[in-house]
Amino acid sequence: PNPPYNDFLRGNGYNVENPWNDHANSGLSDDGERLSGWLLKNSDLPADIEEELSETPYMTQRAIDFMKEAGDQPWLCHLSYIKPHWPYIVPAPYHNMYTKDHIIPPVRSEEEKQTNHPVYGAYLKSRICQTFARDDVRERVIPAYMGLIKQIDDQLGILFNWMKQANLFDNTMIVFTSDHGDYLGDHWMGEKDLFHDQSVKVPLIIYDPRKEAKVSEGRESNQLVECIDLAPTFLDFFNIKDKPHILEGRGLKEILHSNEDPKDWRKYAISEYDYSTRQARHIIGNEPDKAQLFMIRDSRWKYIFAEGFRPMLFDLEVDPKELHDLGESQKKIHLNAKKRLYDALFEWARKHHSRTTVTNEEIEKRTGKEPP
């Protein structure tokens, strides 16, 4: 593939076949040897690229270009910064802004390391988790990861200042979020594949310029919100009627335009993951079509369903760091929580998720009538 970013870099003097790989995501040794950022041992090197030409500033400028081209017409811009992400390497001056002294201790326990849960245990045996469980790897990678985050912070400042100068800031909703988190050694894990909060509890910061949102300015809500809630939120912002037969989410205006959380908000949040391509599936010898994981949580409990294996359960009130798996507990309170959450997950799974062409109103009109 030849993405536009490679053309951009070649146009700025990086005349190699793949400057994204060889410059934006590689460093140099003291003797000039090119060292790949895909290798974690090179994460402390500065990427061999001018900072203003690296990926994150490039994406900021593309967003600005998009807004300029849109002019006065309504628009929606999905500015998807790829970083922080593999390869974990960042250009100067961000590569050495942070050191191992800035790293907080990992959230993990010996009890977790000795887990008898087949899927979790298989992950802990996988190469990526074995790697990120090492302190020397964390001490090399996390400072670069923090540098990548700091670069995004700075670029958002540049973007917002431009929007203010262009008179866009006061009529544009801004949502800052992510698709997932990263374990970085917490729970002896790497990457994103299970359902601890390090992976699934992502930031969600919303700036709503409408006067009705002033009442919630600076407020933090503890309601269970899912990424699928964003699409109906955007439709509402543009005064477009929601299509609940297509979109499963619930718009967030009730939260944004009130100083109190709604009383009838959802009771559960759900996440799902297919680990069929991950090394863990091979370790436990599972079939691809059985490699499904589901998570359902409420305000206190988190329940993880692994097809073919026992569940996991965490009491977030007593154990907010999720260090003690209660999936095998026979205590009544735990049995009740497991049954209730399993039943709620099964109810969700039985819902009709595929009828996306006809509204409920149209269904009512057609009910009991012979087809034409």
Language model feature labels by segment:
Residues 76-79, 98, 204-205, 234, ...:
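A short aromatic-rich beta-strand->coil structural motif
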Residues 126-140, 148, 307, 326-372:
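Long, internal low-complexity/basic segments
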Residues 8, 12-224, 237-246, 333-336, ...:
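Active-site-proximal cap/lid insertion segments
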Residues 106-107, 215-219, 243-246, 265-268, ...:
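Short, hydrophobic secondary-structure boundary micro-motifs
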Residues 180-186, 212, 228-231, 236-312, ...:
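C-terminal cap/loop subdomain of S1 sulfatases and analogous C-terminal strand-loop tails that border
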Residues 62, 201, 226-237, 251, ...:
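Generic recognition of well-ordered alpha-helical segments
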